[in-house]
């Protein structure tokens, strides 16, 4: 892998994002607005907001980064940009790492802003260390980014890329334990939840929120990081020059 080529790709993506203020607004404003909405939905029940607010700090950035990166990568193919880049002496891994660097940086800023607003302005309380919550929120956003880059290879249009949200992300939201504890689900659904990335992302944030810093938390984080690397590797293997 060439560090210079990957960094050049990242700088190009940064330049594109800078010229697209609407995307920046979507990335930075929407997750924060959703957390604020939750705060005022449970204004008379602060305990509920504290219980679900910490896990959602990681889930909202996961969703937005998944959506933005999958659409952006598809647009690069359909406009011919990806084909021109791959005609150059640039390895697939260099290209994907460059995109990963750019979107990981955006994900870090996004998750940090959401966390600062939640803890500073919305008075979200957590029993665990706030710094660790921010780190996990960033990790989950990067996971969403890597999965978005990978799954974009299977879409031919932006509409199809958007459809991955209800097809791939929404079932994970239902089964990760956010709505119903997994041990209270039907056995087949509980087993299925162990194969979903968002289960481990949610569990990690939930444990930090409850100040359960133990080996299970380390396992959850390790699974999230492993899946992130795996998704990027699969993305490099399935990367196509253009959409057929």
Residue ranges and their predicted role:
Residues 198-212:
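Short, membrane-exposed interhelical loops at transmembrane-helix boundaries
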Residues 37-46, 155-195, 199:
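Transmembrane helix segments
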Residues 110, 114, 118, 148, ...:
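Juxtamembrane/transmembrane-helix interface segments of polytopic membrane transporters
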Residues 132-155, 173-176, 226-233:
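Hydrophobic alpha-helical transmembrane segments of polytopic membrane proteins
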Residues 2-83, 92-112, 118-133, 137, ...:
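Transmembrane helix-boundary elements of multi-pass transport/secretion proteins
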């Amino acid at each position: 892998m060439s560090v210079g080529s990957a960094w050049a790709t990242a700088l190009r993506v940064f330049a594109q994002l800078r010229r697209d203020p609407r995307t920046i607004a979507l990335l930075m404003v929407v997750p924060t607005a959703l957390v604020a909405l939750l705060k005022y939905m449970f204004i008379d029940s602060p305990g509920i907001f504290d219980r679900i607010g910490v896990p959602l700090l990681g889930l909202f950035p996961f969703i937005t980064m998944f959506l933005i990166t999958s659409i952006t990568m598809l647009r690069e193919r359909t406009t011919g940009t990806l084909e021109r880049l791959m005609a150059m002496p640039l390895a697939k891994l260099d290209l994907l790492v460059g995109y990963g660097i750019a979107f990981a940086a955006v994900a870090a800023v996004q998750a940090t802003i959401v966390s600062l607003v939640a803890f500073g302005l919305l008075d979200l309380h957590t029993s665990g260390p706030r710094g660790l919550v921010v780190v996990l929120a960033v990790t989950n956003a990067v996971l969403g980014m890597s999965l978005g880059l990978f799954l974009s290879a299977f879409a031919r249009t932006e509409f199809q890329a958007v459809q991955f949200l209800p097809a791939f992300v929404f079932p994970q939201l239902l089964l990760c334990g956010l709505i119903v504890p997994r041990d209270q689900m039907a056995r087949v659904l509980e087993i299925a939840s162990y194969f979903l990335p968002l289960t481990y992302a949610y569990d990690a944030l939930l444990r930090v929120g409850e100040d359960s810093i133990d080996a299970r938390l380390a396992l959850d984080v390790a699974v999230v990081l492993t899946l992130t690397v795996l998704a990027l590797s699969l993305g490099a293997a399935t990367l196509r020059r253009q959409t057929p």
